[in-house]
């Protein structure tokens, strides 16, 4: 009897503790749409840059969300399929017409529209980016601001590429 009363009190205490803790853990959820300046409501990709800003890729361009309003960026293609944020403040953005490099701090873009339909790519910094295009592996040459095929690499059977923290391409 004493044990069942004690168990009942413990359950009651646990219920009160949960009810008090849940509001403390809740976060504000708000709906963000074209009213806040987004170019399109269909968001296909999201990334957070090194400064904490959120970048959203939509069916009509790249959008920078500052917490209150969205700013739009036009790239090599309107359909932004993937965004990779690097630790040094850059974004590599895959569109339907190529892979573009965006300086997140200066808010400028370097367009590379000559590589449509890139499906796999990886990046680690503003100067390190690789992607597969038509069975070949391409690397970014920072000194010339362009991509070139890597010699001796046949990528027909490669399904995924990635860079490890040491800069080794897998």
Tell where the protein language model's regions lie, with residue ranges.
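Carboxylate-rich, polar loop motifs that coordinate divalent cations or form catalytic acidic clusters
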Residues: 1-170
């Amino acid at each position: 009897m004493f044990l069942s009363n004690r168990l009942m009190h413990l359950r009651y205490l646990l219920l009160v503790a949960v009810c008090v803790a849940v509001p403390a853990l809740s976060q504000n959820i708000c709906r963000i749409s074209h009213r806040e300046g987004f170019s399109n409501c269909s968001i296909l990709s999201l990334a957070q840059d090194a400064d904490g800003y959120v970048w959203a890729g939509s069916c009509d361009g790249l959008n920078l969300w500052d917490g209150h309003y969205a700013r739009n960026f036009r790239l090599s293609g309107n359909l932004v399929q993937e965004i990779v944020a690097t630790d040094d403040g850059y974004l590599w953005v895959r569109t339907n017409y190529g892979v573009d490099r965006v300086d997140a701090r200066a808010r400028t873009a370097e367009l590379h529209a000559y590589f449509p339909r890139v499906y796999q790519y990886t990046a680690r910094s503003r100067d390190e980016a690789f992607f597969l295009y038509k069975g070949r592996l391409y690397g970014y040459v920072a000194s010339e601001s362009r991509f070139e095929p890597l010699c001796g690499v046949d990528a027909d059977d490669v399904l995924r590429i990635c860079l490890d923290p040491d800069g080794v391409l897998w």
